[in-house]
Regions:
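N-terminal Lys/Arg-rich, disordered targeting/topogenic segments
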Residues: 1-24
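Charged, amphipathic alpha-helical scaffolding segments
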Residues: 192-213, 281-292, 296-304, 315-316, ...
Length: 331
């Protein structure tokens, strides 16, 4: 009888144990769901209600930038340029062979990564060009991530996505900012990226990313009065805006010339900044802009800038081997 009663007790305990386990699982799921809901609500509130810590893109550009390219809708602007009839005609010319190779390489990158690059959308983007070695230059990419930059979860997942894409990813800190190092297993190239306030900064040269981080609190170009005036003159115009920092042009051009050039130095010592904007349509491609000269500009340069606009036809009879031709007119 005792054995029979024990057997019945064990059978009765089975269903009760299952019910208890089921309750624990349900409670755990409810708590997890509530925690997730609270986190989502917090993230949304933080994203849209908390104050933004935004800084201007130009503040992150290191002072040794020779050229700065600016766009408000980079992907759309690129498609307009690469697909324009004017460019399709120009790229057939022999003199544009090297330029064409670079443009087509960039175009293939844009097309093959269209889904990824579509995330860029209408975001402000800056690309600055810098001399990095005696015969080398590199670019620094600065992309405004807007409110997305406040989502720490997204930043944390970037490394996971990169690893899944085949990159070897390492981390290191510089001046309080985490730098992700993406190594391509095939080419062994390393691309460095960092989130600096509301911007994503990237380059194949680690020193440029570090300089951008350092420039965050000690901007140079962005506070230069000549640059500020130049930027106002071309703001919002054309497909892209290009700024020339004449103070850095001589060292940048020495990459191709092998040494400094007296004519380049002449213009460099006479100019501050130039702001240009590019437009293109079915009939033409044009670049217009403004140059701010120094008060101490060389008289020759001043004469060139103040020359008249009378029509000249000398170019119609010049040899095709002519290296440089300048129109100069005087009142």
């Amino acid at each position: 009888m005792d054995e029979l009663n024990c057997g019945q007790g064990e059978q009765n305990a089975g269903p009760e144990k299952k019910k208890s386990t089921s309750k624990i699982v349900k409670r755990t799921l409810v708590v997890a769901a509530l925690a997730l809901a609270v986190y989502v609500v917090y993230s949304v509130v933080y994203l849209f209600v908390s104050p933004d810590r935004n800084i201007q893109q130009i503040y992150l550009v290191p002072e040794d930038a020779a050229f700065i390219i600016q766009s408000s809708a980079p992907i759309e602007d690129w498609e307009k340029f690469s697909g324009s009839e004017t460019w399709q005609c120009l790229k057939k010319a022999k003199s544009f062979e090297e330029v064409t190779k670079s443009v087509e390489k960039l175009d293939s990158v844009v097309k093959s990564n269209k889904v990824l690059l579509s995330l860029v959308g209408e975001r402000d983007m800056l690309i600055s060009l810098h001399k990095t070695r005696a015969t080398k230059w590199d670019f620094l990419l600065i992309l405004d991530m807007q409110k997305t930059s406040k989502m720490d979860l997204l930043k944390d997942q970037v490394e996971t996505v990169l690893v899944m894409s085949g990159f070897t990813v390492t981390n290191r800190m510089h001046n309080g900012i985490n730098i992700l190092e993406m190594r391509d297993s095939e080419t062994r190239d390393i691309f460095y990226i960092a989130f600096v306030d509301n911007h994503l900064v990237g380059s194949y040269t680690s020193g440029l990313v570090e300089s951008a981080i350092d420039s965050r609190n000690k901007p140079k170009i962005g506070l230069d009065q000549s640059f500020i005036e130049t930027e106002k003159l071309v703001s919002g115009k054309g497909l892209v805006r290009v700024f020339i920092n004449y103070a850095r042009v001589p060292q940048f051009m020495s990459i191709y010339l092998g040494a400094r050039n007296e004519y380049i130095d002449l213009f460099s010592n006479s100019m501050n900044f130039a702001g240009l904007y590019l437009n293109t349509d079915k009939e033409r491609m044009e670049v217009k802009g403004y140059t701010l000269r120094k008060d101490s500009a060389d008289p020759y340069v001043t004469a060139l800038l103040n020359s008249g606009k009378h029509k000249m036809k000398a170019h119609e009879i010049l040899s095709g081997r002519t290296a440089l031709y300048t129109n100069i007119g005087f009142n």
